[in-house]
Amino acid sequence: MNTQILEIRKSLKKKLDPFRFEHTLGVAYTCQALAMRYEYDLHKAEIAGLLHDCAKRFDNETMLLKCQKREIPMSDGELRDPSLLHAKLGAWYAREKYGIDDQEILTAIECHTTGKTDMTMLDKILYVADYIEPGRYKAAELPQMRKLAFIDLDLACLSIMESILKYLESTNCPIDMTTVEACEDMRRVVEAKRAAEQAAAQTAVSLDSNISSSEMDTATPNKEVNKVESVKRNGKNRRSRIRGEKRRRH
């Protein structure tokens, strides 16, 4: 563990309540696990996981005031539900207070609550890790989501987004349009991947069929040759038997 990670952990342990700190460690751990599975940078994944909730120690009113003071853009959905602002404010703290200048990490932190269109690998890793980390127990369909996350990250993202939207609709909670747009975009990604896989499978079947047909075409002339040779051998054998019978008669 390098010095940067140690310093971040030390700071967060002081600033976050015990529950939030344990959640943070769980997300960082899961980010690393997903990064190993999908061959992504483990260090960047861990930092994103550690800092994703660094601003969640503030109440909604404080976050709203801090975002206004720092001129952080806020959507209508975030104004209706200021709890969402911890993502954008967290990205600001990650940059200004923790010295993170990697834009990919900052963007992943900024969109980890709502998602966004055109999500990067790190965006998806953090989004999914936040939902499935070991300390979670109330989220819907957790066992299935945890398994799916290590099989198909895009499909896991889509499934989580759909589950969250379904929950928000059923409880009449405000829905940020960013999440709706992110879900629609991820659905297109998943459908495009399925179409490509089906096309590849059909191509493979077609190639196998062509190879089999070619082998049959090659085998047919050989069968004809063998048939002719067999007829010739049978003819010779028959003539030999006739000559033998004639000699015995004489």
Label for each model-derived stretch:
Residues 18-20:
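A short, charge-rich alpha-helical start-of-domain segment used by transcription regulators
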Residues 214, 219-250:
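Long, low-complexity, intrinsically disordered segments
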